[in-house]
Amino acid sequence: YLPIMNPNIAVFKPQLEDDIVRAFNQVPKLLSGEDLGKQAEKDYCFVETEDQFQNYREQFENAQKIVVDIETTSVSPHTGTILGIAMSTRPHQGIYVSVDIVNKHKQWFHNLFMDKLCIFHNSKFDTNYMETEMGFEFPNYEDTMLLHYCLEEAVGTHGLKPLALRFTDLGDYERELDEYKKSWARKNKVKLADFNYGMLPSDILAPYACKDADATFQLYGKFKPLVEKSEDFNRLYENILLPATHAMKTLEKNGGPINIEQVNWLAEQYQIDMEECLEEINTHEAVQRFERVYEKTFNPNSTAQLRDLFFSILKLKPTKKTDTGAWSVDKEVLTNLNHPLSEAILELREKTKMAGTYISNIKNGVDKDGRLRSGFNIHGTTSGRLSSSGNLNYQNIPRDNKDIKKLFKARPGYKIIQCDLGTAEVYYAAMLSGDKFLQKAFIDKLDFHSYVAKQMFNLPEEVNQVKKLHPNERQYAKAITF
């Protein structure tokens, strides 16, 4: 029993308080000689024959709720396939059914999932996969990931494995699989990024899948009562999070329409542009002088070399320091230098970023139907805002780059529209606080930041004139508001 966490950390990370208390409660048991590593007896089974399936069939039919968890070869049903379905009807149980048995009894599984309360961890992933590949439907389901998000909104704490480590007796059960994966990848000279669960033998994958199902059932038993105790938490979970995750699943299934011809053209054009930028940089007299003085090839991505080039070779005046005290060569500084070299380097940076972050990701991620599918998360922020991850962050499309925007093209008969919910947080604050001053701006449909600026700076103009006549004051008001 080795202490690895100072209890004072709970002051800065309150979400760890329960873990610390739980650890202290274990100390008397440890001192009394109790075996803290002892696990409850498990009922795990890999169902790969008809006889094995029949042994569990009645148990599933008689259960009121069933944990469902799938193992796949890819994160996307458009590029991967289901290997099997793990299920559980009680804690410490996990039944992993091979995909061959599932396909043989597909109608039975369809009826089962239609009739039972199905419990998932990250339901969006499992239901999307099974709906797409097998046509299953889940009219009644719960999600332990969203239950935990209600109880603890901290980012990065909602994964099944860390939650199982904190709240169940299963420990770090992914370790054996990870060790096998690394060993297999080394032996077969395969990159870990190219490894998929279809490469795992059943004696590794099946126990792992069973533990996924077991962990989910145990977490449901802990989280669901806690959420139900709070009227606010329960309303958030039932009325907002569950419907929202269903809506996000629809977004992910649909994906975004991509103009693949434009993607290919832009990839070639940006490559030409980047080569021209490099040519302009490398042939500049100052860069050649740099290479003679420092006896090395100039690297435009090196902050130290940029500093030497602009402030030692060109003798330009530095304007800003970094947190470490070194002269900065960030975008603002290079822009203010107003030098042909700094302009070329800024263009190279921008083109390189666009090519890597957007063009390459879109080109490599687009599916056969010409649509790009990525993730939308309702548990990815502490504020309750959505986040996007995967092939492309759909919430981070460059606002002013028309080249990138042209990569998205509506299918015939449709339009792509751009909407923005302005000052959303302030709207909620006005509604929840009952502040009449805040509410008036929205009731009268005024520009909120202009409205605040007029009051703050006692401006004589009408609210609708502030944005044009006093842009700086409006920006100050905006900064203070947020």
Segments the model singles out, each with a brief description of its role:
Residues Y1-Q15:
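Short, flexible loop segments at boundaries between secondary-structure elements
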Residues L2, L31-E48, S76, G80-E228, ...:
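Active-site-proximal helix-loop-helix substrate-binding element of RNase H-like nuclease domains
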Residues K13-I70, H78, H105, F109, ...:
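N-terminal accessory regions of nucleic-acid-interacting proteins
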Residues E61-Q64, V68-Q93, V99-V102, N234, ...:
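Acidic, glycine-rich two-metal-ion catalytic cores of nucleic acid-processing enzymes
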Residues P77, G156, Y197, P201, ...:
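Secondary-structure capping and boundary motifs in well-ordered enzyme cores
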Residues I82, M145, A164, L205, ...:
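Short alpha-helical scaffolding segments that buttress acidic/His motifs in well-ordered protein cores
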Residues V190-L200, I204, L242-D273:
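Short His/Asp/Glu-rich catalytic/ion-coordination signatures at enzyme active sites or charged loops
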Residues A209, A213, A244-A247, V263-I281, ...:
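Short amphipathic alpha-helical coiled-coil/interface segments
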